[in-house]
């Protein structure tokens, strides 16, 4: 009987303890801690990968050193001063819709048009510092690190831009060409490809350069409203 009585009292005490805890929880419910990562909205942006024909290459009667800046608006017509060249139309069009860009990876590849008997070599290199001057000779381009020298008659390997996770501002070709200082250019570009084309006995198409890239955009650009005519134009 004594053991039964102690067991009954124990059950009653445990029941009172559980009930007291339940009342305390109801009176002071736990407050969930805020999770800043969970509540933060996802960044507005997108990542794109694409390959485009960047440049058709013709050999002339003089050596050529071409400069291809890696920027959001690669769309430089031949003859742009300074000697920027190359057009990635899709990249340039997409970049108009965003404020900033990250070049996750960029490479250029040589694709030949010439016959197996064609002699000569094309050299491609990458310069990441706009303070560095452009080489003036075909052989000088081949000494840059990283660089690649390929026989004109071969479908050659690629030259890859060193990894750079810097966030750059988006800019179009004409605006980039108008920048004066190296520091200004470095705000919009991780560097430039340099392509050296040897001279030939006559002008001839020798190949093309393909660009392959993966880029990430952030911050949708604010589109400018249509021009509102002034008082002098409203009735015309």
Curated annotation (Swiss-Prot):
PROSITE patterns: ICOSAH_VIR_COAT_S
InterPro entries noted in UniProt: Capsid_prot_S-dom_vir, Viral_coat
Ranges for region S domain, virion shell: 52-217
Role, per record: Capsid protein self-assembles to form an icosahedral capsid with a T=3 symmetry, about 28-34 nm in diameter, and consisting of 180 capsid proteins.
Statement: the UniProt record of this protein carries the keyword RNA-binding: yes
GO cellular component, one term: T=3 icosahedral viral capsid
Organism listed in the record: Maize chlorotic mottle virus (isolate United States/Kansas/1987) (MCMV)
Single GO molecular function: RNA binding
Biased composition (Pro residues): 29-44
Major location (coarse): virion
Name of the protein in question: Capsid protein
Domain of life the protein comes from: Viruses
Region (Disordered): 1-46
Chain spans, region R domain, interaction with RNA: 1-51
Subunit structure as annotated in this protein's UniProt entry: Homomultimer.
